[in-house]
Each structure stands twice: as structure tokens, then as C-alpha cells.
Amino acid sequence: MAVGKFSEPLNNYIRENKINNIYISSFIPQKLILSKTDVFITSGGHNSILEAIYYKVPMLITPISSEQRMNGLLLEELGIGETTYSLNKNASISSQINKLLRKQLNVNKLNEISNDLRNQNNNFKSMWDYIYDN
């Protein structure tokens, strides 16, 4: 989990509570994570959504702004993601993540959109490689 300036207090909390399956950092290379993950929990910003689609990763959107709420609704309509409006609803979030992990969404649609994105923008990979390396 990338949390910027909040990484130290969250790491302290994780150590104190002996939580072993969460990694906290001020920066995490998102492309690397997306290339190896099954579900992406994100606030639903445009670039994060594009990167998740590129890597064919279903998303759980936890929107903060109205744009992100709209993005979540669009992903739900396409069948390639879920949206939650409260991180306090643990049971709801758990069931949404399980739904995404069980591929109870439109995997064909996610593959189709990802392939379209890759084909329409032949320089997408090289652009991100350039940004990441520089």
C-alpha cells in the first residue's frame, strides 16, 4: 500500500498488531504490482484505472471525489469492477473482493478493453517504461 507521508505511523501500527500480509511504503511501483496482482483496490483515478485495464486486473474502487465515483460506476456498468462507498463496511468489501477474485465479472470484456488499449496506443508500454526509468 502506497501512503506517502503516512507510511511511518501505519508501519508502526502493522508491527504492533503483527499484521504480516500488508506492506506499507511511501512509494510502490504500481505497474510492477499490477503485473502480479489479482485485484486492485484504488480510489479510481483515471491513470490507475488505465493501468489496471492494461494489465487486465479487476478493480475495487473506493472513490473520494465525484470523478472517481463516476469512474467506479462506469467500471461496474462494463462489468470489470466494483465500487464501495465506505471502508467501514468490512463484510461488503470482503464479498466484493471475493467476487472479483472468483472472476464473477465480465473477464471477456476486461480482456477486450485491455487489448483495445494496447492496440490503440502502441507506445503505451514504451511511454511508461520511459517515465518509470527517468
Task: Annotate the PLM regions.
Residues M1, L60-I61, E82-T84:
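Short hydrophobic alpha-helical runs that function as membrane-insertion/retention elements
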Residues Y54, E76-I80, L105-L110:
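Short acidic (Asp/Glu) and glycine-rich catalytic loops that position anionic groups and cofactors
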Residues M1-V39:
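Donor-nucleotide binding loops and adjacent catalytic segments primarily
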Residues F27-L73:
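A donor-sugar binding/catalytic signature common to diverse glycosyltransferases
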Residues S92-N134:
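C-terminal amphipathic helix plus adjacent low-complexity
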Residues N11-R15, L73-E77, N111:
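Class I S-adenosyl-L-methionine
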Residues K5, N47, S65, N88-K89:
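Residue-level "edge-of-site" marker
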